[in-house]
Amino acid sequence: MTSTVLVDIRDEVTCPICLELLTEPLSIDCGHSFCQVCIIGNSNNSVFGQGGRSSCPVCRTSYQPGNLRPNRHLAAIVKRLREVALCPGKQLEVIFCALHGEKLQLFCKEDGKLICWLCERSQEHRGHHTFLMEEVAQEYQDMFQESLKKLRREQQEAEKLKALIQEKRESWKSQVEPEKRRIQTEFKQLRSILDREEQRELKKLEVEERKGLSIIEKAEGDLIHQSQSLKDLISDLEHRCQGSTVELLQDVGDVTKRSEFWTLRKPQALPTKLKSLFRAPDLRKMLKVFRELTDVQSYWVDVTLNPQTANLNLVLSKNRRQVRFVGAQLSEPSSLEEHYDCSVLGSQHFSSGKYYWEVDVSKKTAWILGVCSTPVDPMFSFSQYSSKQGAYSRYQPQCGYWVIGLQCKHEYRAYEDSSPSLLLSMTVPPRRIGIFLDCEAGTVSFYNVTNHGLPIYTFSKYYFPSALCPYFNPCSCIVPMTLRRPTS
């Protein structure tokens, strides 16, 4: 049997972990074999998952530590190899200097490469420390063995981190999917008005999901790249350690530096919990508001404007559903006194029962809406009020007005008896306003239909002494005010 064949056989019966001939070889499920001590140590250090499984150091296939099987055939081959005492490393491969054609028998410490006796005497290597190959081979053999131990530890840690990243990925997805389903279930009850809100919530969640997965995938990609570099370096070192002395020492400087300075870059903090979770109570509140609006809209009446009550500064549409101010526009109205002649009443009168109507005030910078108990005289003069507060006092329940209004483009106010005006907070500026009158309950309620029917303000527990009329005041804003038709 030739030495080449024996070397090939030796490679087949060498433990991939300790790189020595197999001792008491054990085989695992994938077919790879290892020394008994080596594979048991690997099983103890690389357990993952709830089933207590380990992964093969060669092909990473999972196996049960309890399924280790003695391989008597390999043990017999190892025994025969030990008897012939095969040691291929002692049969030196002879190579020649590419520059001088002489045998490469010397090793230059400074350059970390093999040289011939003529190279040693050249200017390039003058003053360098040179040794016979055999004198330094063991030093680098020991050095590489230590590097291999360190790099294998790094490799094991990298594999553990890969498993951890995979678990984080599954955990992340398991958080996202139930949350997505819960959001969709909650929104089913509000589908008619909440399509935009549902999409917004899902979009936010998807953005967070993509951001989290992007972080995980980046960490995974970086780890895969590092693992490949690590495997290449380990393969290079293993090839050098298993090959001839020439292969061991050829261009040793570069691989020495790579081995010494190689360090695993650990991934940055991985996401574990969603930053923001959808809260169902908010939807229940919105559902309650929606149901309240739906209830009052069941009393929707077809209100039209009464042209006999409109001032000359106002123009009504032919269908009497729209009113527009056409007088001199006031740039900075200082008080309600400047709007005294801008009102028009509805054609209907209400003395009992429940009634609802809607008004479109889109793009208007000023308006007043509600009900009044007595006809408004278009020629009424505010001269009797000597102050701005006096002008405001006209629009109070004690004077027969239950109204709210927009002033100075951004100020929403309710005109109560207790105060000249009560400032209202609007998170969403209303483009459509719903007015609900309950004569028996003595209430006038206003709803922001634009914001899914959120209540704006309610005048409550009033006694209405006479019939009430819908009240409309476009103020000095030329943008029209429009009554909406009842929806089916």
UniProtKB/Swiss-Prot annotation:
CDD domains: Bbox2_TRIM5-like, RING-HC_TRIM5-like_C-IV, SPRY_PRY_TRIM6. Residues 282-488 form the B30.2/SPRY domain. PROSITE patterns: B302_SPRY (PS50188), ZF_BBOX (PS50119), ZF_RING_1 (PS00518), ZF_RING_2 (PS50089). It is an enzyme of class 2 (transferase). One of its GO terms (cellular component) is cytoplasm. It comes from the Eukaryota. A zinc finger (RING-type) spans 15-60. Pathway: Protein modification; protein ubiquitination. Keywords: Coiled coil, Cytoplasm, Metal-binding, Transferase, Ubl conjugation pathway, Zinc, Zinc-finger. Zn(2+) binds at C97, H100, C119, H125. Belongs to the TRIM/RBCC family. Homotrimer. Forms heteromultimers (via B30.2/SPRY domain) with TRIM5. Interacts with MYC. Interacts (via SPRY domain) with IKBKE. Interacts with VAMP8; this interaction contributes to the activation of the type I interferon antiviral response. Interacts with DHX16. The B-box zinc finger and the linker region between the coiled coil and B30.2/SPRY domains contribute to higher order self-association. This is Tripartite motif-containing protein 6. It comes from Mus musculus.
